[in-house]
C-alpha cells in the first residue's frame, strides 16, 4: 500500500513540470495576435474601408499559407473614428488589455502619430503607410511602407511638375490651394517653393479648414486668377467639391492636380476628366505583371463590389495596406520570431519586394532615401491610369490637359 502510494506521488511529481508548461505550450501554438485601428467611421472612413478589405484579403491568404511561424494569425482591428486621440487610447488597450503580440499602424497622419507615441512607450515596432509628416517620425521603431521619401515636400511636387511639363501646353501660372489637413498642407508649402524654383508663377494661394464644404468663394477667386494649372492640396472629397463649385460658375481649369482625392468619386465625377493625383499602384501593366498583385486585384474587386464601395479597383490606399502586411510577414519570417527589437533591426537593414515595389528604409526616420515609389496618375474616360514617369505609364498613356 505504501509502495503504491509512493508510486502515485512519484508520477504526480513527474507530471507537474508538464502541467506547468501547458499554458506556455498553448501560447506557442495559439494564434499570433496583431492589433491595429482604422477610421472605419468619420471623415476618413472611405480610405480606411479600402485598407480593411485589403488587410482582410492578406490575412486570409496568410493563414491559408500556414500563418506565421506555423501558427494562425488573428488581426484585431478597432474603429478609431478617424480621431487621433481615440487611436491613442485604443493602441494602449491593444497592448495592455488585448495583449497583442504585434502592432500594425492605423490610417492617416494624425492617428499614426498617436499610435507611434504608444508604440515607443512600449518598445513595439510600428509599420505604417500613410504618414505625411516624415520629420515628426522620430521613433526608431517605426517604419513607413507608404513608398515615400523623407523629403516629400520637394520630391512629390517635383514629380508632379515634371509630369505637367510633359503636357502639350506646359503650365506657366499655377493656382495653389491647400486644405489645412496637416500632411497635404505641408507638401503644398513645399510645392510653392518648387514652383518658384522652376521660374513659374503662383497665380493665387488660398487655403481652407479641413471639413469645409463650401468652395464657392474659392472657386470664384481661382476663376478670376485664370491659372494654367490648379494645385489642390486636398484629401477625400475636397477636390470633388471644389471642382463642382467651379463647374457651377462655368469654369474648368486647363489642368488640375489633386493630391489624394477619393479615387472612385473622382474617376466617376463629370469634373474628373484629366485630373491628376499621386499613386504607387494602378490596375495596369507593369504593376499587374506581379502574380501576387494580379490575384489581389481579382479578389479585391470582388470584395469591394460586394461591400458597395464607390471604387472597386486597387489603388494607393489598398495597395500600401497590402504591402505593409507583406513587410511584416517578411520580418517575422526573417527573424523567425516576434521580438520587436529583432524585427526592427531586420527591417532597418533589409529590402522587401512588395506589390508597390521594393521597399527600403535607408533614408531619414526610416523612409526611402532619394527617389521614391510614387507616380502621377490621371483620370481618362472614367479610369485612373499612370501617366508619369513614362516607364510606369499605362500603354499609350500620356499627360492630358494644358
Protein language model annotation of sequence segments:
Residues 21-38:
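C-terminal segment of N-terminal export signals and the immediately downstream linker at the start
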Amino acid at each position: 500500500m505504501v509502495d503504491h502510494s509512493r508510486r502515485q506521488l512519484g508520477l504526480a511529481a513527474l507530471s507537474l513540470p508538464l502541467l506547468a508548461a501547458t499554458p506556455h505550450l498553448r501560447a506557442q501554438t495559439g494564434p499570433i495576435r496583431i492589433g491595429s485601428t482604422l477610421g472605419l467611421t468619420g471623415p476618413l472612413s472611405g480610405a480606411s474601408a479600402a485598407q480593411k478589405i485589403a488587410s482582410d484579403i492578406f490575412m486570409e491568404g496568410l493563414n491559408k499559407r500556414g500563418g506565421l511561424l506555423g501558427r494562425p494569425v488573428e488581426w484585431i482591428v478597432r474603429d478609431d473614428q478617424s480621431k487621433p486621440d481615440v487611436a491613442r487610447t485604443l493602441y494602449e488597450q491593444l497592448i495592455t488589455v488585448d495583449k497583442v503580440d504585434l502592432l500594425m499602424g492605423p490610417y492617416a497622419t494624425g492617428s499614426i502619430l498617436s499610435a507611434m507615441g504608444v508604440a515607443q512607450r512600449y518598445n513595439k515596432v510600428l509599420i505604417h503607410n500613410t504618414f505625411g509628416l516624415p520629420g515628426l517620425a522620430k521613433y526608431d521603431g517605426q517604419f513607413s511602407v507608404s513608398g515615400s521619401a523623407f523629403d516629400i515636400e520637394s520630391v512629390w511636387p517635383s514629380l508632379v511638375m515634371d509630369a505637367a511639363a510633359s503636357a502639350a501646353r506646359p503650365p506657366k501660372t499655377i493656382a495653389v490651394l491647400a486644405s489645412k489637413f496637416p500632411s497635404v498642407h505641408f507638401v503644398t508649402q513645399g510645392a510653392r517653393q518648387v514652383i518658384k524654383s522652376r521660374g513659374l508663377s503662383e497665380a493665387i494661394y488660398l487655403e481652407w479648414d479641413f471639413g469645409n464644404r463650401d468652395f464657392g468663394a474659392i472657386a470664384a477667386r481661382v476663376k478670376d486668377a485664370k491659372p494654367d494649372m490648379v494645385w489642390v492640396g486636398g484629401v477625400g472629397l475636397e477636390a470633388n467639391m471644389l471642382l463642382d463649385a467651379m463647374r457651377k460658375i462655368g469654369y474648368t481649369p486647363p489642368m488640375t492636380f489633386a493630391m489624394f482625392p477619393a479615387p472612385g468619386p473622382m474617376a466617376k465625377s463629370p469634373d474628373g476628366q484629366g485630373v491628376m493625383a499621386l499613386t504607387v499602384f494602378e490596375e495596369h501593366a507593369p504593376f499587374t505583371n506581379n502574380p501576387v498583385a494580379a490575384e489581389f486585384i481579382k479578389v479585391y474587386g470582388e470584395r469591394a463590389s460586394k461591400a458597395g464601395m464607390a471604387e472597386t479597383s486597387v489603388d494607393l490606399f489598398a495597395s500600401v495596406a497590402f504591402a505593409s502586411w507583406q513587410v511584416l510577414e517578411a520580418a517575422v519570417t526573417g527573424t523567425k520570431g516576434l521580438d520587436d527589437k529583432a524585427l526592427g533591426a531586420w527591417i532597418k537593414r533589409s529590402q522587401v519586394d512588395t506589390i508597390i515595389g521594393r521597399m527600403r528604409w535607408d533614408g531619414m526616420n526610416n523612409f526611402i532615401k532619394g527617389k521614391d515609389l510614387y507616380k502621377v496618375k490621371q483620370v481618362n474616360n472614367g479610369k485612373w491610369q499612370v501617366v508619369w514617369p513614362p516607364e510606369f505609364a499605362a500603354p499609350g498613356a500620356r499627360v492630358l490637359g494644358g
